[in-house]
């Protein structure tokens, strides 16, 4: 392993994540804001605790009561006047349903002078859920969508049809109270109705689009689900004000600034990366082949969210697959490294945020008798990168603004 490049990568990751934490953005939005009636806080998503904590520090006892729903292991400590739930992700579980029911009961009976402060971040689609079908049916269709390689927009289009709170329905439940929504975006282009399936946003997707997804992936759905697929979601909401605070664009900008501090010339490739993870890794490696002898320190940056088609039974995530896929292409390059992370600190069903590879990675695996292509076929990037000390482990970061992949070329 190139320890110098790995240290630079770790430092860039640490500083960039700190730059996109939601705390200050939430406080800035709430500063000097006046409220007439009750203030009810609802925070949902992987960054929910962090956002709720910031709101509590800003508003204090002006918050009457609140609920946080976040992923297991993401609640750091109690927050006064706010009940914290941890629940399942990426597949909702009984705690998801229990916590969401508690939210529905809390916002019922509010009047037009009251405000629901709705703090939303990625992961909310699984965490904030009251299904119109059984929990088993919901888990089954979610697993089908994840396994077939459906992207997040397609997954959320289906989820909206099957939920009491998605696709603008939560905002309807809050009426006549006003909903002040602060959103941390984890979807490319920041489409409000797709972030966490848009609980407080008028829905732009249609039943026709949902049916197209069912047919595209040949999903196996029950007769009850088929009936729900024909019920439209709210197309207009008059009680919602929304602010977007944080996105993958800001994450890429933070990475760019940090690369510059280490003397690397940043090259922004895209903040809309959406392809197979293996293809992204191979693409970054191809850039390295072209520029590795330029004599310049270069950093190629790509933000977005890639896709993995699950064909094996291994352990890993899309960012780990990007790093491992790049390893073969940069084999033997002493001045090249690729790292890729999920900004929330979680990549797939693992404890890693992502992965790192450099010119030594492929050789180390070969010496251990491991074929990178077979590993990728089995979706087992985690265990391969563990052998090369290529796992990036940050723990829950408190933010969630997509992923970022970086190719470093030193001089």
Task: Describe every region a protein language model picked out.
Residues 70-112, 154, 158-159:
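Glycine-rich oxoanion-binding loops at beta->alpha junctions
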Residues 1-42, 50-51:
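An N-terminal, well-structured beta->alpha segment
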Residues 68, 72, 79-83, 128-182:
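Glycine/threonine-rich beta-strand-loop-alpha-helix active-site module
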Residues 54-63, 81-84, 104, 108, ...:
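A glycine- and small-aliphatic-rich helix-loop capping segment at beta-alpha/alpha-beta transitions
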Residues 134-152, 203-218, 313-338:
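Gly/Ser/Thr-rich active-site loops/lids in small-molecule metabolic enzymes
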Residues 324-411:
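Internal helix-turn-beta structural module
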Residues 159, 177-180, 202-283, 287, ...:
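Accessory alpha-helical/coil subdomains and C-terminal extensions
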Residues 153-219:
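A glycine/threonine-rich phosphate-anchoring loop and its flanking beta-alpha core
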């Amino acid at each position: 392993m190139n320890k110098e490049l790995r240290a630079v990568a770790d430092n860039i990751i640490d500083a960039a994540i700190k730059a996109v934490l939601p705390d200050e953005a939430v406080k800035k939005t709430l500063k000097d804001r006046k409220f007439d009636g009750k203030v009810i806080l609802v925070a949902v998503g992987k960054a929910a605790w962090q956002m709720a904590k910031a709101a509590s520090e800003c508003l204090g006892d002006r918050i009457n009561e609140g609920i946080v729903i976040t992923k297991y292991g993401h609640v750091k400590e109690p927050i006064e006047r706010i009940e914290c739930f941890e629940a399942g992700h990426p597949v909702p579980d009984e705690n998801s349903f229990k916590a969401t029911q508690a939210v529905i009961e809390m916002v019922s009976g509010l009047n037009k002078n009251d405000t629901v402060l709705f703090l939303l971040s990625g992961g909310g689609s699984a965490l904030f859920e009251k299904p119109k079908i059984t929990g088993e049916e919901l888990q089954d269709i979610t697993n089908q969508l994840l396994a077939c390689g459906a992207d997040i927009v397609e997954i959320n289009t289906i989820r909206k049809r099957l939920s009491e709170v998605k696709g603008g329905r939560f905002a309807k439940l809050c009426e006549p109270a006003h909903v002040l929504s602060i959103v941390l975006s984890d979807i490319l282009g920041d489409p409000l109705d797709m972030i966490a399936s848009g609980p407080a946003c008028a829905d732009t997707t249609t039943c026709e689009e949902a049916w197209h997804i069912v047919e595209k992936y040949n999903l196996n759905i029950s007769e009850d689900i088929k009936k729900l697929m024909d019920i439209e979601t709210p197309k207009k909401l008059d009680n919602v004000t929304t602010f977007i605070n944080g996105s993958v664009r800001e994450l890429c900008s933070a990475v760019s600034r940090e690369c510059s501090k280490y003397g690397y010339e940043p090259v922004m490739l895209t903040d809309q990366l959406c392809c197979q993870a293996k293809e992204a890794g191979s693409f970054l490696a191809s850039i390295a082949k072209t520029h590795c002898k330029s004599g310049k320190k270069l950093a190629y940056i790509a933000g977005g969210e890639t896709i993995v088609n699950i064909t094996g039974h291994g352990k890993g995530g899309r960012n780990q697959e990007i790093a491992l896929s790049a390893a073969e292409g940069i084999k033997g390059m002493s001045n090249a490294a690729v790292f890729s992370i999920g900004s929330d600190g979680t990549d797939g069903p693992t404890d890693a945020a992502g992965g790192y590879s450099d010119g030594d990675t492929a050789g180390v695996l070969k010496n251990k008798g491991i074929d990178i292509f077979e590993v990728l076929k089995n979706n087992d990037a985690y265990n391969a990168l563990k052998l090369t000390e290529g796992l990036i482990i940050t723990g829950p970061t408190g933010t969630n603004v997509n992923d970022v992949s970086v190719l470093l070329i030193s001089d």
